[in-house]
Amino acid sequence: MRHYEIVFMVHPDQSEQVPGMIERYTAAITGAEGKIHRLEDWGRRQLAYPINKLHKAHYVLMNVEAPQEVIDELETTFRFNDAVIRSMVMRTKHAVTEASPMVKAKDERRERRDDFANETADDAEAGDSEEEEEE
């Protein structure tokens, strides 16, 4: 079986359907003896340019190992599903399991935000103790 990277974008009004879509697609892959190496739901993001007068879309990334028949079936499903506004299936040489740059950047921002919040809380506590000493 070959390795594939699949990215599909869902209409922003259909975002609540994304978990069900992911479940159906993963069931099709695993049902055909395939493996899912990475699954990332990037959520609703701004598009680089408008597609069908839309400026946002819900992104999903999957790295899978599956037979060609399943990939053909997925591509057909993407093509005839009105909620999917764009999709791309690429064959890769190896399984990709590490987090994508999108998720890494989000994690780094979260860590920086948490560090800043902790520093701010520590500074506030230090300021409160100094005021108590002055009184």
From Swiss-Prot:
Pfam families: Ribosomal_S6. Coiled coil: none annotated. Residues 120-135 have a biased composition (Acidic residues). SUPFAM superfamilies: Ribosomal protein S6 (SSF54995). Part of the 30S ribosomal subunit. Interacts weakly with uL2 in one of the 3.5 A resolved structures. Belongs to the bacterial ribosomal protein bS6 family. Binds together with bS18 to 16S ribosomal RNA. This is Small ribosomal subunit protein bS6.
